[in-house]
Amino acid sequence: MKIKVVVHPNSKKKRMDKDLLGILHVYVSEPPLKGRANMAVIESLTKYFKTKRRNVILLSGSKSKNKAFEILGSY
């Protein structure tokens, strides 16, 4: 399954919201330095979809707040 994600780094609280267009908004407390925010988003997605880390693949947007992920396996 492919999903679109908008990342909000440096947030006070970690949370996830889905808007009316089906885009997932992920709020993480980590800064967008050296991939820390990306790793935090991947960690959040693994918990949300109850899957393993290797099943969450970043397709595009490694340096952008707008990202595309692919979730493999059953969820």
Language-model features: where?
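Compact, glycine-rich, soluble single-domain proteins
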Residues: 6, 11, 21-22, 26-35, ...
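A generic structural signal for short beta-strands and their flanking turns/coil linkers
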Residues: 1-3, 20-24, 52-54, 65-67
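Residue-level marker for the onset of beta-strands and adjacent loop->beta junctions
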Residues: 1, 12-13
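C-terminal structural segments of small proteins and small subunits
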Residues: 42-75
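Short, Lys/Arg-enriched charge-dense amphipathic segments
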Residues: 4-8, 57-58
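A structural signal for short hydrophobic beta-strand segments in well-ordered beta-sheet cores
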Residues: 16-17
